[in-house]
C-alpha cells in the first residue's frame, strides 16, 4: 500500500499489539545510527496476540519493571495518532501485510538489567511480560 490518507488508514490495519522497544544505550550513544542498538535478537518482543477490534486512540499504556510502575500514559497523548502514522509512512515506502509500526514510548525510559521482569499493559490488550536476559 502506498499514499494512504489518514481517513483510509484503518482499512489497512490488521490489529494492535504490545511491544517492548529495547535499545542498547552504550551503542546508541557511540553511533549516529539507531539500527544496531535496536537490532539484537531479543530486543523487540511483540504480543502476546493481535487484537483486531479495538479503537487505538484512547487507551491507557503502562510499563512495569519488577512490579514498579515506570511508564504511565495514554495513546491519546501520541504526537501523531495511529492513522496519521500509517498515512505518513505510506508516503515514503510501500507497506506490506505483516509490517509492524511502533508508535514510540512514554516518558520514563530507564536502564534494565538481566533478570528484570518487564510488563507492558495496554488497555484492551493482553499484557506482554518478559524477563531480560
Task: Explain the meaning of each model-derived region.
Residues 1-5, 54-56:
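Short helix-loop capping/hinge motifs at secondary-structure junctions, enriched
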Residues 17, 25-133:
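Catalytic-pocket segment enriched in acidic/His residues
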Residues 3-14:
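N-terminal accessory regions of nucleic-acid-interacting proteins
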